From Swiss-Prot:
The keyword Mitochondrion applies. (Microbial infection) Targeted and hydrolyzed by C.botulinum neurotoxin type B (BoNT/B, botB) which probably hydrolyzes the 78-Gln-|-Phe-79 bond and inhibits neurotransmitter release. SUPFAM superfamilies: SNARE fusion complex. Changing E42D: No change in susceptibility to C.botulinum BoNT/B, BoNT/D or BoNT/F. GO terms for cellular component: cytosol; mitochondrial outer membrane; neuron projection; plasma membrane; SNARE complex; specific granule membrane; synaptic vesicle membrane; tertiary granule membrane. Keywords: Coiled coil, Congenital myasthenic syndrome, Cytoplasmic vesicle, Disease variant, Membrane, Mitochondrion, Mitochondrion outer membrane, Neurodegeneration, Phosphoprotein, Synapse, Synaptosome, Transmembrane, Transmembrane helix. It comes from Homo sapiens (Human). Belongs to the synaptobrevin family. This is Vesicle-associated membrane protein 1. The gene is VAMP1.
Length: 118
């Protein structure tokens, strides 16, 4: 008849099939995976927090930039209107000077004509 089954040798209870080194118990593997996943989740949450902070900071800077752009636009409009007024003012001054110069030249011509023809 056949020989009775031999009990396993001492120290071989946790060994992997094939006689390799013993593997961790299944409970330890799932705990390690859970810890790794939690660490990854915490890392992603930290990255998201940083990104949200950056977005809020960027929004604030854009708001400030928009306010400055509005103020600059208002200043540019005011400058444009005052420059147009100044241009008109000096155009009229120039016209007056030309009229005065023409009148003076006309008077000089009249004086010369009267002096030579009388």
């Amino acid at each position: 008849m056949s020989a009775p089954a031999q009990p396993p040798a001492e120290g071989t209870e946790g060994t992997a099939p094939g006689g390799g080194p013993p593997g961790p118990p299944p409970n330890m593997t799932s705990n390690r995976r859970l810890q790794q996943t939690q660490a990854q989740v915490e890392e992603v949450v930290d990255i998201i927090r940083v990104n949200v902070d950056k977005v809020l900071e960027r929004d604030q800077k854009l708001s400030e930039l928009d306010d400055r752009a509005d103020a600059l636009q208002a200043g540019a409009s005011q400058f444009e209107s005052s420059a147009a007024k100044l241009k008109r003012k000096y155009w009229w001054k120039n016209c007056k000077m030309m009229i005065m110069l023409g009148a003076i030249c006309a008077i000089i011509v009249v004086v010369i004509v009267i002096y030579f023809f009388t």
